Regions:
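C-terminal and inter-domain tail/linker signature
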Residues: 1-161
């Protein structure tokens, strides 16, 4: 499969709510997947499908959309920018549903081998997603300043003369 079509299929797999869809795009014998929510690498299309299933449980309308051109290197590595659009409608990782709609930008970096994704890393800002869900205080608010003070970062201090 050509790389652009492969990433289109990858995005459809994340958007389609069919955990078996990852088998068509991932190397069935030797896949390695990581993102900020995986505690350890996932090493089968079935494991990636189960991981996506947890996302679909909490965000029933989750969809991944292309946001720019895919970059393909001569060595089989490729990158695909995308955004996740979703509404938090059910419990996920212990977080009760907020009903909030989020947009999380990210990029998938992968090694393509024999027309399939082999080594895959999805990068996205987990803190931004949590902020959109209302978990931590929004940047620049008094809540954030109070939290930073409690964590020991405090306000800027004037240097001693």
């Amino acid at each position: 499969m050509e790389t652009d079509a492969l990433f289109d299929a990858w995005e459809r797999a994340w958007s389609g709510r069919d955990p078996d869809a990852f088998a068509a795009v991932c190397d069935p014998e030797d896949v390695h997947y990581e993102d900020p929510l995986t505690a350890a690498p996932l090493e089968s299309p079935e494991a990636i499908g189960a991981h996506a299933g947890r996302l679909w449980e909490g965000f029933k309308d989750a969809r991944l959309q292309k946001t720019g051109p895919r970059l393909v290197g001569p060595d089989g590595h490729a990158a695909a920018p995308a955004k996740l659009l979703a509404t938090h409608t059910a419990e996920l990782y212990g977080l009760t549903p907020t009903g909030r709609f989020i947009i999380v930008h990210g990029v998938t970096v992968a090694q393509v081998r024999d027309g399939r994704l082999h080594r895959i890393r999805m990068f996205f800002d987990l803190y931004d997603a949590a902020t959109q869900l209302g978990v931590p205080p929004r940047p620049g608010t008094m809540g954030e300043k109070a939290l930073l003070m409690l964590r020991g970062f405090g306000f800027k201090r004037e240097p001693k003369p």
